[in-house]
Amino acid sequence: MAKCGVPQRVPGDCFRPVSTRHPRQIPSCFSICFLTHEAQSLRALAHSWWSGALLLLLLFLFLSLEQTSTSYNAKIKQKVGECPRQRLECRNESLSSCKTDFNCKAHFKCCQFACGRKCMDPYEEPCMLPSDKGNCQDILTRWYFDSQKHQCRAFLYSGCRGNANNFLTKTDCRNACMFVEKKGQCPLFPFQMRMECPASCKNDMDCPEKEKCCESRCGFICARVWLVKTGFCPRKPIVCSKIDKPKCLQDIDCPLDEKCCTRCGLKCLKPRH
């Protein structure tokens, strides 16, 4: 039988004594003893390794979240709604107040209008807005369209903020607002029993903000528009077991970008694009 040698004694305490015996072999034994300073070095090395690994893991998670956020924002570049079309031929761009929709408050969008990018309500006609001087200190002469008097008028602009009814020249104001066709669809009037009546409007700008100049049973009148949102309604089912009570009558009755669609009864649905 083999015998263990006499252990050599050195100053210090063992960090973790270990003894092992292998069965079915020639019996032998050994002990492992780390000196105190070696144990401390091992602890420091292990702590350093785990700290480095944790730091790398946190860095990886941060970069992953950053990439996910960037890709998400790239997919959702625009808010719901449609900007008014650019109505002027611009030789010089005016100062822009935004770059993307997400620079604008609430549901406002960053739109190219009147030769500059600005935050606008996609559901408002800019030429129907009142004059707004803004809240800075400059004194600049600008032009706005007075929808009540149906003419372009000068006003003093402070140099920032304000709204989209703001033009550099009277000509720009006239070109952008005098003969604008508002968004939306005129309501359908019956063609029977038409009468000859004097027109109460000549174009959309003769009407209040949410009305258009529409042909009716009695000449042209200002009528509340049917707002038609972008996209197409989903296909109707071939057979309906029952017809539900209408939840809407037109697109404007539906929230956000949903449309009023026929699907076993009128209801608000997500459109197809």
UniProtKB/Swiss-Prot annotation:
- Show where the WAP domain sits: 76-123, 179-226, 228-272
| Membrane topology recorded in Swiss-Prot or TrEMBL | Single-pass membrane protein
What keywords are assigned to this protein?
Disulfide bond, Membrane, Protease inhibitor, Repeat, Serine protease inhibitor, Transmembrane, Transmembrane helix
One Gene Ontology cellular component annotation held by this UniProt entry: membrane
- Name the predominant localization: membrane
- PROSITE patterns from the UniProt entry: BPTI_KUNITZ_1, BPTI_KUNITZ_2, WAP
Question: What sections of the sequence does the record tag as coiled-coil?
Answer: none
Location of the BPTI/Kunitz inhibitor domain: 127-177
State one molecular function term (GO): serine-type endopeptidase inhibitor activity
Please give the start and end residues of each transmembrane region: 45-65
Q: Where in the cell is it found?
A: Membrane
Q: Which cysteines are joined by disulfide bonds?
A: 83-111, 90-115, 98-110, 104-119, 127-177, 136-160, 152-173, 186-214, 197-218, 201-213, 207-222, 233-261, 240-264, 248-260, 254-268
Concerning Pfam families, the annotation shows: Kunitz_BPTI, WAP
What this protein is called in its record is WAP four-disulfide core domain protein 8
Task: Give the organism, scientific name.
Answer: Mus musculus (Mouse)
